[in-house]
Amino acid sequence: LVSSEMCIRDSNYIMKNFNLWLGIGGSLLITLPVQAQKKTKEKQPNVIFIIADDLGYGDMSCYGAHRIQTPHVDALANSGIRFTDAHAVASTSTPSRYSLFTGHYAWRRNDTGVARGDAGMVIRTEQTTIADMFKSAGYTTGAIGKWHLGLGDKTGTQNWNKKVSPGPEDLGFDYSCLMAATGDRVPCVWMENQQVLDYDPSAPIEVSYTQPFPGEPTGKNNPELLTNLKPSPNHGHNQAIVNGISRIGYMKGGGKALWKDENIADTIIAKSVGFIERNSDKPFFLYVGTNDVHV
C-alpha cells in the first residue's frame, strides 16, 4: 500500500513540513504538516500510515532480521527514512492508537487501557484528531483494519444490529472498515462506516463481556468444537466460539457477517486498495491497522 507520492520520499520536505514521531513495537505517532493551512501550488502528498501490533525492532530484515525477510518494508526503508532511535508511547493496542490519533499521552487518562470489544469510544468527540487536521487541509480520510478504540457512547450498550455511534466519522474519518476491537475479541464482524458489513438479519447480534448466552457453546465447555486453536484460559480465550476459535467475550448471532480469520489480511488489503483507487485524484490520508503479527 504505497502511494507514488508518499510524504516519506524526501528528507528535506519532511524536515520542512512535518514533525514525526515513530514508535516501533506496536505504536507509531505522526503529526500533521505544520503548513497545512497554507494554500500552495505544490500537490499535497498522499499519506498512508500502517501500524502493526507486537512488531519488534528486530523483526524486519531492514533492521537486520534473518529468519524472516520483509522485502516490501525494506523497499519503503530504502526509498524513505529508516529510524534507528525511536520510542513507543505505549506497548499495547488501545493506548498506542489513542496517542496516535490525538497526540496526547494515554497515561494522562485512566480509561485508555486495553479496551473490551464492547467498549464505548475512548476518544471523545470534542477532541481534535489527526483525521480532523488532515480534513482541514483538504484531505479525504480513511481508517481500515484493527480499531480497538471502542464504538458507541457507553461500554456494553451498543446495538450491533444498527449503526453504532459515535464512531470514526465523529473523529474526522470519511470512510472506515474496521474490526471493532481485536481478532481474539468479539464481536467478530467487520464494521463498515459503523454498521455491520454484510449484516445478516436472520442472525441478530448480541455481545456480552459479563455473562454467556444460554445455549451458546464456549471454548471452556465445548473444547471439541475448537477446530483451529485450543483455548487459553489464562488469557480468557475460552469464551464464545467463532470460526472454530474461542474468543474473549460472549457473542451470539452474526450469521453470514462473521469473519473468517484466514481472510482478515486479504480484507484489509482489498478495502485499503479500494479506498486508494477511489481517491486517486485527490489527496488522502489512510490509517491501516494490520491484524497479522499480533500475538
Positions of predicted regions on the chain:
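Short, small-residue-biased leader/transition segments that mark boundaries at the very start
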Residues: L1-I8
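N-terminal secretory signal peptides that target proteins for export/translocation
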Residues: R9-N17
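Short, low-complexity, intrinsically disordered N-terminal modules
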Residues: S11, L32-P33
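Formylglycine-dependent sulfatase
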Residues: K16-N19, I24-L28, V34-V295
